[in-house]
């Protein structure tokens, strides 16, 4: 079943279409091709030199090493592809923010042009009003002159001339009134259009400003959520993600190696304590199943329980077996290095939050109480200094 699952993962990776493969950078392509070649060569090696029938007769830790050698590059490739997509999404958001800022500049230019247009309209309206005032002044002057001319005519009794002159003045006043009304209506329409255009431009600028703030905030959140290790000022998001990937690869390899070492120590200890190799094999198989189900600390917890509950038997096993001493020394030294690496991170970094004070810390503490840094057992009541901080 495990081999079938691995083959399914390989086929899934090979099933990428050409468009998706073309979007990957050179490093991601090389990692993907390398992982596929690694998986194929591993399967060919198992088929030719080991045989599928002999695969399930291996010891649990040997079977685990075979699975790990096949699945590890595939898992690293999936991680690299995910990080590449994150970098692309961050770059896309940055380009959108840059484009939006350029659009804001063009909108400001449009507003300036519209303001100049409004200024020209106001000047034209002022000129028309001034001309209308001049025409009204001339009308008043003509009216006064007409009255001055009408006075002698009225005294001489010429009613017909007075009637014609009054009709002429009335028609002129009606024409002027109609012109003033049309001018007032046109001015009101221009003011309304100006107000509507101004409100529309203001609303558009506000919406663009809000959109720019939302995109900037989302970009900041993505950058902060992907920041793992403390980096010097001036690093862009892609460099921060590269640091996170490097740290994750180092810690992942170290923890996988520690899990295999803990499995070997457990196997030697249980065989020496109980003498039941079949029972030990079933127990290790159960732990391996739990490990592949997602419990990556199951070997650490089991070894902690043995170090706490059967410390004397574990020390005797290490005293009698050189390989057990070397494996315990390896666990202590690697755990110390991992703890130092995690302690160098910022207290708010994701790596430190995940790994600090975990099962590996408990395993280091339990073993340091009964063993020196070189794996030698301590038989005194007071545990000596093992070189740990």
UniProtKB/Swiss-Prot annotation:
Causes tubulation when added to magnetosome-derived liposomes, binds liposomes; may be involved in constriction of the cell inner membrane to form mature magnetosomes. Binds preferentially to cardiolipin, a component of bacterial membranes, with very poor to no binding of other tested (phospho)lipids. Addition of cardiolipin to magnetosome-derived lipids increases tubulation. May function with MamX, MamZ amd Mms6. Its main location: membrane. Residues 53-62 are lumenal. Disruption phenotype: No growth phenotype, retains a magnetic response. Magnetosome vesicles are slightly bigger than wild-type while magnetite crystals are equal in number but have a much wider size range. This bacteria makes up to 20 cubo-octahedral magnetosomes of about 45 nm in diameter which contain membrane-bound crystals of magnetite (Fe(3)O(4)). GO terms for cellular component: magnetosome membrane. The gene is mamY. The keyword Membrane applies. Keywords: Biomineralization, Lipid-binding, Magnetosome, Membrane, Transmembrane, Transmembrane helix. It is a multi-pass membrane protein. One of its GO terms (molecular function) is lipid binding. This is Liposome tubulation protein MamY. The lineage of its organism: Bacteria, Pseudomonadati, Pseudomonadota, Alphaproteobacteria, Rhodospirillales. It comes from Paramagnetospirillum magneticum (strain ATCC 700264 / AMB-1). The chain crosses the membrane at residues 32-52, 63-83. It is found in: Magnetosome membrane.
